[in-house]
Regions:
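Conserved donor-binding/catalytic core segment of Leloir-type glycosyltransferases
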Residues: 40, 88-105, 111-114
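Short alpha-helical donor nucleotide-sugar binding micro-motif in glycosyltransferases
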Residues: 157-158, 165-170
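Carbohydrate-associated surface elements
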Residues: 45, 66
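Short hydrophobic beta-strand element within catalytic cores of glycosyltransferases
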Residues: 195-199
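A short, well-ordered alpha-helix in the C-terminal region of glycosyltransferases
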Residues: 237-251
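Conserved acidic donor-binding segment of nucleotide-sugar-dependent glycosyltransferases
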Residues: 210-211, 215-221, 230-235
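Aromatic "clamp/platform" in nucleotide-sugar-dependent glycosyltransferases that forms part
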Residues: 178
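Membrane-proximal helix-turn-helix segments that form the acceptor-binding/catalytic region
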Residues: 22-39
Length: 271
């Protein structure tokens, strides 16, 4: 069996020069998957992509990702620890991105959207980037260019305990990536009741119900900025979405492993 998560054609289009080389690469990848007894896709959108566009013929089912994170026991204490470590005012609204600092994740979009939100009147906020990557210098230059040096905090790499506290401290998890298929970080955020804000057309948003346990908005910086401000203005609505994110989207690996084990036994028995 094999797992399906990466949008290979997109990777090959971005990194291979010649069409023949892209075809050879896709053919080689799909020969592997089509030789499997069963494939597991990380969400329904990826399953459809592989079956409709990539020519997957093997049996395929959706197997959702999960996390080993757990809800912080004391959110107020976690917030104080984060504020002290990163110099954040206790009354500041916090937004968070966790992952590779790479513009393929559309993190520059998030920064420009926040600059627009600041123009629209958003005050007293911090945008935390937790992670390392090849575009740290480019991101820092963009932050300076847009006048957000006070608002943007580069956290670097953190351990699991602090990462859970970062998710808990954040009001929103900003994830405008159009590249990711189904990221673990959105499940980690949901574990702490922190809803994610996605873009329309993002495959990684296919596991949420917009306005119920997460948010999806048009892929423009102005629309994203307005969405953030509208979400924060509707405190009752935000509380409902936050609770639903944890209830609907938080899934532990302990739960998933039981199902995976049963599937392994089923496949072994069939063969």
């Amino acid at each position: 069996m094999a797992t399906l998560h990466s949008p290979y054609r997109q990777d090959f289009d971005n990194n291979l020069k010649y069409n023949w080389s892209k075809r050879v690469a896709m053919s080689g990848i799909m020969r592997v998957f089509n030789a499997c007894d069963e494939c597991w896709a990380v969400n329904g959108s990826i399953k459809e992509l592989y079956e409709s566009d990539y020519g997957l013929k093997s049996a395929c089912k959706v197997r959702l990702n999960a996390t080993d994170h757990v809800p912080v026991p004391d959110a107020a204490l976690a917030a104080r620890e984060v504020d002290e470590r990163y110099g954040i005012p206790s009354d500041a609204t916090v937004f968070l991105f966790v992952g590779r600092i790479n513009f393929i994740k559309n993190i520059d979009f998030a920064v420009r959207a926040l600059a627009r939100a600041k123009e629209l009147g958003l005050k007293n906020f911090r945008m935390l980037f937790a992670g390392k990557g090849q575009d740290e210098d480019k991101l820092a230059a963009l932050v300076q260019e847009l006048g957000l040096t006070e608002e943007v905090v580069m956290c670097g790499l953190t351990d699991k305990d602090m990462l859970e506290k970062l998710y808990s401290r954040a009001s929103l998890f900003l994830f405008p990536s159009l590249y990711d298929a189904n990221s673990l970080v959105q499940i980690e955020a949901a574990c702490q009741g922190t809803p994610a804000v996605f873009l329309e057309g993002a495959r990684t948003a296919s596991t949420i119900t917009p306005g119920v346990n997460g948010y999806v908005c048009p892929a423009s910086e102005d629309a994203y900025a307005h969405a953030i401000m509208d979400i924060l203005a509707d405190k009752d609505g935000y509380a409902r979405v936050s609770a639903a994110a944890r209830k609907d989207l938080y899934l532990s690996w302990d739960d998933v492993v039981r199902d995976v084990y049963a599937d392994y036994l089923r496949l072994l028995g069939r063969n």
